Amino acid sequence: MAQLKPGVVSGKDYLTLVGAAKEGNYALPAVNVSSSSTINAVLEAAAKNQADVIIQLSNGGAQFYAGQGLKDGFKAKVLGAVSAALHVHLLAEHYGVCVVLHTDHANKGLIPWVEALLDHGEAYFKQHGKPLFSSHMLDLSEDPMEFNLSECARILTRMAPLNMSLEIELGVTGGEEDGIGHGEHDASADNSHLYTQPEDVLQAYERLSPIGHFSVAASFGNVHGVYKPGNVQLR
């Protein structure tokens, strides 16, 4: 575990957490949650194992968290994520663990969801002096590179003053997760995009690093979910 004050971490503390994991040769598990019960289970497991952890919500998980009684699906996705974040903020320090609070894959259609969460995040930061979420993810890997980087730059410009980090995706991860997926795990498809290209990473670094902190979800042939035997070639 990193030698940090327990609770939700962000900014320099987030970098310290990642640095401790690298130095200690261990991974930070990222666990998707969809209810207060699953959040509590993750916190309890982390505390028992004296391990820091990433707690994250997909858009569907956030909607489920808000409950089926909310008929406005978009509002449910926003309020569910905010409610879950507040729950983690309240309890994490009492479990004695450091938590990176993150939202999972958001494609082009979910950019408004991320922006709505930033609206809440800016209000939270103004009141508490810290961000609501540690980081968000934009998965625009199916879109042209220029659109991917320009949108990531625009969103990161909002996030940087809040001491938040942005996760981006370069190269397509095959399969599907919570409705966000790609069909390139099919053996008949041209799967060259399943492998992140070094020149794309360099371009992202040159474009985004002057704005704020970001991380890259790199693809090396890995896929989400179920796939046919022989179709996955990791390299």
Residue locations for each model-derived region?
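Short catalytic-loop micro-motif centered on adjacent basic/acidic residues
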Residues: 28-32, 101-103, 137
